[in-house]
Amino acid sequence: MREPQRSRIGVFDSGVGGLTVLRELYRQLPKESILYFGDTARLPYGKRSPQVILQYVREILTWMAAEEVKMVIMACNTSSALALETVQQEFNMPILGVILPGARAAVRQGRRIGVISTPATAASNAYRHAIHEITPDALVWQMACPEFVPLIEQNRLHDPYTLEVAKGYLQPLLDADIDTLVFGCTHYRHLTPVFQQILPSHIRLVDPASHVVKAARQELEVMGLRNSEMSIATRFTVSGCPQQFAELSHQWLGFTPMVEKISLPCLSSICPQPLEIRE
């Protein structure tokens, strides 16, 4: 059995969105080793029910616990909104979500806060609740953006249609005169060049990825689990097509990762089928 400090940090998302968190881990915690899982066979998570999301998260965490990770970062806002509090009580390892770190960062930037997210995250009101717990007088506008994750996973970042979709989602927030925009989905950082074509320069962008990694660093230090030796290569795993994930992730990682397909433990007698993503 390896020393706890040498164990990997588990990171999971529905797809490539969690790579934004992974890059922050490389930057802020370069000596840590990572196990990354993308649940690509079942994305997008944003249209799933809370019950299904909780089942998916339990399956992922059960597998990661068997892999002896020392911590898990839920690099998925939908999972963080709908499952974090429950699974923190069920699993004997530190599990961090992205919403509270994102909310804390948002209120440091402004008081008129727009949040773009998946429909499930928006419906949960998780960001609104988290922001108001910190700053009750902050104004929060939430916008569900169901098309963003499929467009990113289909590598349509430079498609003119994506720009038009983004304009439609962002215009109500601009009409509300927001001063801060929170990426309420880890995928959305990949759309930053698109957003910059639409948003005035005074609107501050908040990406929770960097803030959840800062929280992870602090947690590791408190628990005495920081690794001080050389890291080992990141292990990339998916539930869907490894080649598709590897090709898509190259543009954000700067290298083409070796990706393996794994099978999660099914904790229900009926495992929901993946949603079909249509163009």
UniProtKB/Swiss-Prot annotation:
Q: Mention one GO molecular function.
A: glutamate racemase activity
Q: Does the keyword Isomerase apply?
A: yes
Signal sequence residues: none
Q: Which UniProt keywords apply?
A: Cell shape, Cell wall biogenesis/degradation, Isomerase, Peptidoglycan synthesis
Whether Cell wall biogenesis/degradation counts among this entry's keywords is: yes
Reactions accelerated catalytically: L-glutamate = D-glutamate
User: Which InterPro entries does the annotation name?
Assistant: Asp/Glu/hydantoin_racemase, Asp/Glu_race, Asp/Glu_racemase_AS_1, Asp/Glu_racemase_AS_2, Glu_race
Source domain of life is Bacteria
List the PROSITE patterns: ASP_GLU_RACEMASE_1, ASP_GLU_RACEMASE_2
Q: What is its EC number?
A: 5.1.1.3
Q: For substrate, which residues are the binding ones?
A: 13-14, 45-46, 77-78, 186-187
Gene Ontology terms: biological process? cell wall organization; peptidoglycan biosynthetic process; regulation of cell shape
- The catalytic residues are 76, 185
Question: Do you know which HAMAP family this protein is assigned to?
Answer: Glu_racemase (MF_00258)
What does the similarity note say? Belongs to the aspartate/glutamate racemases family.
What is its biological role? Provides the (R)-glutamate required for cell wall biosynthesis.
Listed name of the protein? Glutamate racemase
Q: Which organism is it from?
A: Synechocystis sp. (strain ATCC 27184 / PCC 6803 / Kazusa)
